[in-house]
């Protein structure tokens, strides 16, 4: 019996403009997966579209069709074996020809394809594989023109995109360029076999006390015969835990394992993200013919929605433990998707863990990510909120579209269902908001799917019928949510139910970020504030020295957000003393972003302790797809902005918070208040009660001296997984204590300072922050690590260290107050390298 064999078709390709029939038109392709922009750049036919205005120079590529071709030798084919040509992804309108005969036509980027080419490869010798990629931009416009009755409305990009199953951000978004890729964007190979394990999956039943788990393992067998047997082995850290053998019934072999005292999969910060390995080996006639394995986790995951005093809850519970989901939204990490390596994916997820984030939302305008992305999330304990790929639009529902969408959903849920990191599937991004804003028909009480198809919002059929049925069938233990935002069919801005995208800071009514916590809902799955990336990133795409000023054309070109000039200007001028030199301007935008994220996260985490009022906060956005100015808190080159560190501190396992009442200075003729209230609290995600000491000092901004007696609370009992209020009715008498002062809080547990927070008078522009007496001393040095000791004579706001590639700082964007030295560890900086530069407000 012949065993399974596969032959990669990654090399030997060439490509050309489909309309150029000259002999010299063909150009080499280094390897696939790739997309045409990568191959054009490699052949010096295109310059890096991420630099300067070169995106415009690349626009001609968007309206072209392309042909890829390779010649390969027929592999050895044992008697009785089949040869399968397998494509894991074709972008997007692809006609595949083998020896001149069409064997596949595809129009969905998110689907894999398997074609039996046994007969087509009958002859030995060379075989020609050719793929014509039709222009997706033009095909989309043709499809739109064929259905003028449909309401083609949405946000971002050409509305025609909604007729094509291709990554929607390729049409351009408010943070990314218009780069219409085409190509073999995922692996292609030949498989030769008589039989194989086509799929392997598990279903887990974990006992309430976690002392035992039953794992049911299933293997779908293709080509099974009467002698077929599947050997299942469950292992942990390379050690066998259990094994069993089963014969396929109706092409599926099934076994059940009883695991005593299982090691559970936990999000980072709550326990180890333990992974078991399940393998399935197919034996026929006493010989092994194929084997596959997958990593799985034993855990329960649920979304708790129950009536309460705030409305209806929305939070995640893992293994019986309520988890406040502090995290980020994820967009594709590059416009040229095949250029993202597994190592780069892992660095992104490692950065999240470094920032104490526990959830990432894969946004619905990108793609179902590469396996290595989810593997990193599994291994590092980052939960995944997985959108289906629909974003910001009113999607058509032609019969062929619905058929393609269902296949897409089935393929991707089956591909991803073994990942313990995936805890929720969500139907779309903001499509229900499009429905609301455009006045499309949506009657939540109408439960007849055929009526939905007849309405002017027909995609409800996708989100409330096709997708939930696919998830229920193929991943029944995973929660499904119709859209983001969405809550029981109510208006998407309802703060009492479901999840919410809160954009009234930056977009919408442009509220002050100081009140962000009052604007949230039950789960804040989008919110954000723009900031410039670091100067090193700007220098990558700004070529000319004369363009290095804040309002230059090239900088505006690299900020795709509508109205970004006035929004950035508004938040800067309201809060800070503005500047016109680029380096200072960059820093000031970063201060605003860091403060915005802090005010939001800090308040919403506090609300977690109030009957789970807020179940989580996923900022928009973690990352960028090109070097740009956006809402990202880490730029394209994985360089964290100050907001990254501000969020990490608020998500500390135990965090102290202090906040005074901030009066709106811009609507009261800037009249200072006579009195202000303040509050002091501790937020904890620990699962046991903790005792600590809390101190609150009142320090003059001008002198650094204490202006009133400090408050100390010893032996504070900190409640587990919640909020402990220390002071709820504090009062500052501004007539008695007239000089501006900070409220500096510290928390000790077991004699060690574990958390700090500093509340500042608002706005910063009214404060004189010169002459801070800041001292940064190097107190220890090794080959690649330095420890800095930082002190100040007067309060310092937002001390930010330079970001260098390969160098990691343990903290940044810090507030330093007199009498409280802080340490920062710098890893990866060689002893002979120049010290990191730093900047603080008022410097």
From Swiss-Prot:
Record field: catalytic activity: Hydrolysis of terminal, non-reducing beta-D-mannose residues in beta-D-mannosides
InterPro entries the UniProt entry points to: Beta-gal/glucu_dom_sf, Beta-mannosidase-like_N2, Beta-mannosidase_GH2, Galactose-bd-like_sf, Glyco_hydro_2_Ig-like, Glycoside_hydrolase_SF, Ig-like_fold, Mannosidase_ig
EC identifiers of the protein: 3.2.1.25
Pathway: Glycan metabolism; N-glycan degradation
KW Hydrolase (keyword) present: yes
Single GO term (MF): beta-mannosidase activity
Signal sequence extent: none
Glycan attachment positions: 721
A Gene Ontology biological process term: glycoprotein catabolic process
Keywords assigned by UniProt, alphabetized: Carbohydrate metabolism, Glycoprotein, Glycosidase, Hydrolase, Polysaccharide degradation
Pfam families in the record: Glyco_hydro_2, Glyco_hydro_2_N2, Mannosidase_ig
Active site: 430
Enzyme class: hydrolase
Top-level lineage group: Eukaryota
Remarks, miscellaneous: In contrast to clade A beta-mannosidases, which are likely secreted, clade B proteins appear to be intracellular.
Function, in words: Exoglycosidase that cleaves the single beta-linked mannose residue from the non-reducing end of beta-mannosidic oligosaccharides of various complexity and length. Prefers mannobiose over mannotriose and has no activity against polymeric mannan. Is also severely restricted by galactosyl substitutions at the +1 subsite.
Entry's family note: Belongs to the glycosyl hydrolase 2 family. Beta-mannosidase B subfamily.
Name the record gives this protein: Beta-mannosidase B
Source species of the chain: Aspergillus terreus (strain NIH 2624 / FGSC A1156)
Lineage: Eukaryota, Fungi, Dikarya, Ascomycota, Pezizomycotina
């Amino acid at each position: 019996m012949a065993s399974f064999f596969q032959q990669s078709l990654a090399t030997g390709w060439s490509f050309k403009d489909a309309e150029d029939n000259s002999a010299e038109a063909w150009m080499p392709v280094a390897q696939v997966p790739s997309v045409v922009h990568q191959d054009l750049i490699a052949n010096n036919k295109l310059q890096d579209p991420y630099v300067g205005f070169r995106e415009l120079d690349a626009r001609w590529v968007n309206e072209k069709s392309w042909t890829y071709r390779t010649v390969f030798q027929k592999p050895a084919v044992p008697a009785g074996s089949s040869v399968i040509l397998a494509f894991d992804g074709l972008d997007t309108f692809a006609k595949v020809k083998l020896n001149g005969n069409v064997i596949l036509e595809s129009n969905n980027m998110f689907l894999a394809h398997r074609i039996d080419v046994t007969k087509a490869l009958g002859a030995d010798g060379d075989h020609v594989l050719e793929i014509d990629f039709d222009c997706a931009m033009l095909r989309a416009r043709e499809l739109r023109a064929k259905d003028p009755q449909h309401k083609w409305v949405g946000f971002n990009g050409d509305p025609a995109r909604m007729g094509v199953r291709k990554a929607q951000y390729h049409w351009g978004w408010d943070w990314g360029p218009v780069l219409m890729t085409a190509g073999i964007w995922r692996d292609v190979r030949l498989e030769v076999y008589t039989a194989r394990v086509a799929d392997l999956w598990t279903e887990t039943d974990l006992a309430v006390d976690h002392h035992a788990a039953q794992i049911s393992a299933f293997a779908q067998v293709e080509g099974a015969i009467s002698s077929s047997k599947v050997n299942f082995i469950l292992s942990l850290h390379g050690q066998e835990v259990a094994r069993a053998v089963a014969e396929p019934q109706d092409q599926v072999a099934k076994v059940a394992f009883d695991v005593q005292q299982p090691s559970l999969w936990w999000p980072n910060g709550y326990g180890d993200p333990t992974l078991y390995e399940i393998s399935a080996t197919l034996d026929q006639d006493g010989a092994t013919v194929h084997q596959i394995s997958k990593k799985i986790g034993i855990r329960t995951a649920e979304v708790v929605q129950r009536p309460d005093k705030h409305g209806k809850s929305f939070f995640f519970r893992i293994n019986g433990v309520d988890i406040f989901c502090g995290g980020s939204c994820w967009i594709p990490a590059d416009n040229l998707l095949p250029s993202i390596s597994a190592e780069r994916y892992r660095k992104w997820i490692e950065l999240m863990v470094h920032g104490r984030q526990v959830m990432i939302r894969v946004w619905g305008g990108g793609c179902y990510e590469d396996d290595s992305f989810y593997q990193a999330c599994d291994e590092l304990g980052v939960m995944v909120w997985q959108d289906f790929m629909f974003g910001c639009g009113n999607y058509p529902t032609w019969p062929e579209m619905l058929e393609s969408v269902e296949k897409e959903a089935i393929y991707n849920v089956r591909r991803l269902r073994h990942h313990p990191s995936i805890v929720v599937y969500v139907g779309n991004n903001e499509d229900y908001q499009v429905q609301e804003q455009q006045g499309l028909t949506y009657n939540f009480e109408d439960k007849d799917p055929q009526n939905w198809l007849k309405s002017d919002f027909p995609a409800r059929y996708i989100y409330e019928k096709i997708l939930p049925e696919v998830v229920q069938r193929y991943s029944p233990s995973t929660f499904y949510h119709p859209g983001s935002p969405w809550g029981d069919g109510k208006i998407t801005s309802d703060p009492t139910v479901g999840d919410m995208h809160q954009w009234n800071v930056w977009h919408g009514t442009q509220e002050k970020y100081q009140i962000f916590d009052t604007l949230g809902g039950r789960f804040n799955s989008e919110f954000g504030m723009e900031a410039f990336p670091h100067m090193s990133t700007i220098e990558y795409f700004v070529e000319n020295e004369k363009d290095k000023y804040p309002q230059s054309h090239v900088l505006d070109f690299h900020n795709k957000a509508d109205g970004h000039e006035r929004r950035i200007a508004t938040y800067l001028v309201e809060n800070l003393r503005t500047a016109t030199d680029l380096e200072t301007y960059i820093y000031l935008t970063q201060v605003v972003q860091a403060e915005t994220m802090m005010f939001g996260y800090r308040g919403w985490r506090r609300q977690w302790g109030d009957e789970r009022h807020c179940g989580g906060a996923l900022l928009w956005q973690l990352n960028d797809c090109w070097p740009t100015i956006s809402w990202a808190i880490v730029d394209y080159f994985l360089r964290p902005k100050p907001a990254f560190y501000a969020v990490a501190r608020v998500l500390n396992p135990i965090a102290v918070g202090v906040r005074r009442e901030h009066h709106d200075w811009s609507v009261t003729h800037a009249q200072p208040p006579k009195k202000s209230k303040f509050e002091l609290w501790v937020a904890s995600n620990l699962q046991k009660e903790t005792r600590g000491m809390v101190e609150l000092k009142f320090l003059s901004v001008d002198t650094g001296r204490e202006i009133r007696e400090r408050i100390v609370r010893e032996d504070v009992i900190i409640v587990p997984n919640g909020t402990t209020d220390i002071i709820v009715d504090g009062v500052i008498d501004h007539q008695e204590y007239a000089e501006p002062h900070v409220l500096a809080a510290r928390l000790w547990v077991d004699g060690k300072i574990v958390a700090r927070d500093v509340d500042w008078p608002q706005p910063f522009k009214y404060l004189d922050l010169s002459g801070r007496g800041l001292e940064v001393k190097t107190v220890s040095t090794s080959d690649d690590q330095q420890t800095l000791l930082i002190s100040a004579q007067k309060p310092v706001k937002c001390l930010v260290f330079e970001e260098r590639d390969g160098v990691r700082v343990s903290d940044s964007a810090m507030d330093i107050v007199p009498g409280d030295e802080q340490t920062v560890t710098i890893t990866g900086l060689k002893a002979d390298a120049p010290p990191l530069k730093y900047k603080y407000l008022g410097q």
